[in-house]
Amino acid sequence: MRTNYCGQLNSAHVGQKVTLCGWVNRRRDLGGLIFIDMRDREGIVQVFFDPEQKEAFSQASELRNEFCIQVTGTVRARPDSQVNKNMATGEIELAAESLSIFNRSEALPLDSNQTNTEERRLTYRYLDLRRPEMSQRLKTRAKITSFVRRFMDGEGFLDVETPMLTKATPEGARDYLVPSRVHKGKFYALPQSPQLFKQLLMMSGFDRYYQIVKCFRDEDLRADRQPEFTQIDVETSFMTAEQVREVMERMIHALWLDILNVDLGAFPVMTFAEAMRRYGSDKPDLRNPMELIDIADLVKNVEFSVFAQAANDEKCRVIALRVPGGASLTRKNIDEYTQFVSIYGAKGLAWMKVNEKAKGIEGVQSPIAKFLTNDVVNSILAATNATDGDLIFFGAGRQGTMSDAMGALRLKVGRDLELTDLNAWKPLWVIDFPMFEEDEDTGSLSAMHHPFTSPKDLTPAELTAHPVGAVANAYDMVINGYEVGGGSVRIHRNEMQQAVFSILGITPDEQREKFGFLLDALKFGTPPHAGLAFGLDRLVMLLTGTDNIRDVIAFPKTTAAACLMTNAPSFANEDALKELAIQVTEKEVSTDNE
């Protein structure tokens, strides 16, 4: 039906007869001629209809925006005065000789001349995807997946599919359950990841596996989360954590070169403890130059009890955050930041403006200065490398709360004051995560990554004796404050796997019920293995410069896990439920999926 794409025509096609298919992007009548901008997935080209081509000209008079058409004509060079350097096809135009209207269009419910609400865009997603910026994002996504497949194939990895209907296993989030018609009362679970299957593939001898795969998690959504998402899933046998990281770093490095022509350089490696200490986050955004400084040793004996109490409690932190040029902040600004950190559990935010550092306590402005000595103030100024015109924020309290609150404040202030270099790329590896997280209230332990992660350099007995403080052989790749991938060395011995399950409070009977197949497989010569998974959607989001993951998925869900276009989820009919032996005891009253 066509010989070329609109956006791929150029001066090399001058004199050629071509046939194009696409949509009317815009129509205008000028000096007895009809001009249209014709659009397809590759771009836009100008088409003009001359009255001498009577039939085509007559049909062209009926054209309106978004009519779907076919045009045949001859490519010709535009006069120099009419060259449009803002268009990829701006040096040429198509002289139309025939026109077919495939389909007419009603007035669009989306207005291309103004910003449409996301709700409206998602309701008419098929129209939203016609927009060049949306089309370009999906094309980039396709380019990324093709690149990943070529890279992984070249490294000797095998693309192996794993099941979509599987067994519910505890992996952190809630499962999406699928009822079985044949086995009434039983349910499949949609996989949160192919984790156990890819480990079983290692046990089967497929020592290099990858898959670009859909995963499902029934969890609260954020701007960078979806209930169904895509992973680049990787697993290897007989490779160390360092070797896995080396291969994956090469892939991401090559991907950025291919898509953006950006050299990411070597990725620095930072421990979890260092990341939390310096940045208050296990996914630090290194584009922001500010760091958290622990000053507990400097304020243990001050009269300000908020500082002194926290400084003398090993479970607490006293943190200083120097803001370059921050002395210009108003009291209203500071109050707003104080309110901001309260979201993360902080009970307050102290501050100090540095007017003349050389004068010590006399050269600073702070509501807490009266509780501090000149020596303490000088020590704080030295520890934070403060200079005249800076402001120092302080937080004191429990370690977790302070890391979260001051880490979030660091990010917000960095953006607000334009201290963060938004044009830079700052990747790194974060390693040596805690094996377990301890609930501050109950003291119970949960796996920080998942229960199949191997500890570093511990026997099952040593891990059981001292689980708190154990370090996992785990690693995350972080780019510009986003965790784009995470992985670990896996447990490959039965005794260690049972020990981890027991520490997590999973009884032997529950272990057999939920993970019997895995425990059995670990008895038969399981090789050492390690892996990693990248969030494809998040990678595409970064590479296309958007901050909303819904912009890089063709048909995404809302933050309420609903599809506004199809009105999913929807009620099932009674016959279908009866066949599945399911009785609905409570229904959602509202059908509003917003």
Swiss-Prot record:
It is found in: Cytoplasm. SUPFAM superfamilies: Class II aaRS and biotin synthetases, GAD domain-like, Nucleic acid-binding proteins. CDD domains: AspRS_core, EcAspRS_like_N. The keyword ATP-binding applies. Gene3D superfamilies: Bira Bifunctional Protein, Domain 2, GAD-like domain, Nucleic acid-binding proteins. GO terms for cellular component: cytoplasm. ATP binds at residues 217-219, 226, 483, 535-538. Residues 195-198 are annotated as: Aspartate. Catalyzes the attachment of L-aspartate to tRNA(Asp) in a two-step reaction: L-aspartate is first activated by ATP to form Asp-AMP and then transferred to the acceptor end of tRNA(Asp). Belongs to the class-II aminoacyl-tRNA synthetase family. Type 1 subfamily. This is Aspartate--tRNA ligase.
